[in-house]
């Protein structure tokens, strides 16, 4: 009666088509290209950038809700670049079983090749490479290891800002003002998650205008009591919370005469 699927948007389309003949309800948690807006009134701007980079690299970047597009005021791009470089330098790629490793390999050769192709596209399209790049990290001559990669001065029409990379690749995009930041954040086919750092009331006001199913403010973590899911091509339905249970329930009306 219901199909629940987590995966890429491309695969989600095929699942929905396959379920259509049976008129099954379909709930899907699909891709994302989440914006991480660092507001000018953030209490510790450098720390917000630093942690945003490392959050993007979590699970080797293989997270649907990863904050892969960092939005910073154009006037503070230089400051953001320095903090991002420092964060990328802290990332240690290697055997996941080794102490001190923070990033392991990506899942497959197919994904390895896709990520490297997108990194090459970023370079070709004129994004400023400030950390990482194509190929394996030094000292790793085999395995599907990706260099933790950061691009700065990215524009939102570049391939690396449009496509879900699903790897440790961050883009830093400059914005003029709040309206510009909101427009850039919403200029994507995805709508899974969003991240905002700034003065709390200001951040909440921005969060209300971001078209995503979830927004994390000032580093707040996921909450399993809150519904998890997105808008647009990031899927439909919800996991977690009361709404997550309701996806698996049927409504029945019973009428009886006295």
Which role fits each region the language model picked out?
Residues 2-5, 193-195:
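Short catalytic-loop micro-motif centered on adjacent basic/acidic residues
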Residues 2, 8-155, 217:
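ALDH superfamily catalytic-core signature
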Residues 37, 89, 119, 124, ...:
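Conserved C-terminal structural/oligomerization subdomain of aldehyde/semialdehyde dehydrogenase
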Residues 7-8, 167:
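Conserved phosphate-binding and hydrolysis motifs of nucleotide-dependent enzymes
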